[in-house]
Amino acid sequence: MTKFETVRGMKDYIGIDAEKIRYLESIFRDLAIKYGYSEIITPVVEEFKLFALKGGEELRETMYVFKDKADRELSLRPEITPGVARAYIQNLQSSPKPIRLFYFGTVYRYDEPQYGRYREFRQAGIEMIGDSSILADLEVLDLLYNFYDKLNLSNDITIKINNIGVFRKIMDKYNIEDNLQEHILHLIDKNKINEALDILEKNIKNKDIIDFFNKILTKKDTKLEDIESLAELEEVSRLDIKSEFLYLFRLSRILSNLNIKFKIDLGFVRGLAYYTGLIFEVLHPSVQFSIAGGGRYDKLIELYGGLPSPAIGFAIGVERTLLVIKDLKVEEPVNVIVIGMSEDAIPSMFMVSRILRKEEYKVVINTKDQPLSKLLPYYASQGFKLAIIIGKQELEKNMITVRNLITRKQISVPLENVEDAIKQTL
């Protein structure tokens, strides 16, 4: 007989594991709505070139790419931001700005599976399109911080920040083409600093600039006053990047006033090719990888054929976030089992179940043909707190019996008084 299992790098989530994912989703959704964001749901399947246009053909090696029957090259999305950008151009470009959108969905990457890395995983994220202000950046960071605060993780996490605009402006000044810029930033992201500097040296041919570049890359935990000092350096003025450092100084000072724990890492870049300014990642001491990240991508929408539109967003790794939560207790409704002792009891079983479900109780109707002496201990072992019993005597008197399966306390009441009886027995 053929035996089927999950595809490598993918996982089934059953029972409490599925509930934890839905719990995080509900926390994130409620928070995003309170910040004024509207939900967007985009297709899992997009044209491959949507991702390759900025990320390059090498993305093919880490994606699920295929052709449909019309010979169109499609892919399972490896992230959600490009799909949101495409949807914005297609549906929302003429709407008042800024546009605030949030999402929750699955993404797919053909990576080597390991702890914290899956081929199918979930992202929760936001995108703010049409606003280039520092207030927009702060709102996004504040929302991200508050999400982790609601999970009681705000004291543990650190938000690592940088301004990738520093690197972009230096490379633009020396006419380094976009594809080579992405390659250099990719090398820095992979901590291949010497390789990146070698390429820069061949293209810039100015030792002072290379030394300055190297100096920036080594500043992994930069103090606020150091940023202010850097902004006054002669090389910074000559390279026309003073505004990039001053922006980072302003942002950091306000984050400090908001009591958001962060660190400035001037050597930090993110692997995605479309970032233009602020970039950030959420770090937790219990894991070696980031659990969320994002940044500003002011040129992506124009690249896709839309009008120039500044934008910023982030994506939370849902499974990665669950890995760092020690004791996530999902609040569950009281479990109730309804047991009828004869076929005549069936209408009453469904009536009482309807009443309780309207009041948010979790109600299951017993389908086992076994004596009560076996059913009660069985359901107690399965986590049910209460049993509603409808036997011959109860039917004759139009009553029900409510029994607490833990304390064994029970009372009999008219069916319409079932809620009061439950409160008395809990």
Swiss-Prot record:
Gene Ontology biological process terms in this record: histidyl-tRNA aminoacylation; L-histidine biosynthetic process
Q: Which reaction does it catalyse?
A: tRNA(His) + L-histidine + ATP = L-histidyl-tRNA(His) + AMP + diphosphate + H(+)
GO cellular component labels: cytoplasm
Location, primary (coarse class): cytoplasm
Write out the GO MF terms: ATP binding; histidine-tRNA ligase activity
Q: Does the record's keyword annotation contain rRNA processing?
A: no
PROSITE patterns in the record, alphabetically? AA_TRNA_LIGASE_II
Record key words, sorted: Aminoacyl-tRNA synthetase, ATP-binding, Cytoplasm, Ligase, Nucleotide-binding, Protein biosynthesis
Q: Which InterPro entries match?
A: aa-tRNA-synth_II, Anticodon-bd, His-tRNA-ligase, HisRS-like_core, HisRS/HisZ, HisZ
EC numbers on record: 6.1.1.21
Q: Where is the signal peptide?
A: none
Compartment(s) where it occurs, according to its Swiss-Prot or TrEMBL record: Cytoplasm
Record's Pfam families?
HGTP_anticodon (PF03129), tRNA-synt_His (PF13393)
For this chain, the family text in UniProt reads: Belongs to the class-II aminoacyl-tRNA synthetase family.
What's the name of the protein? Histidine--tRNA ligase
Organism lineage reads as:
Archaea, Thermoproteota, Thermoprotei, Sulfolobales, Sulfolobaceae
The gene name reads hisS
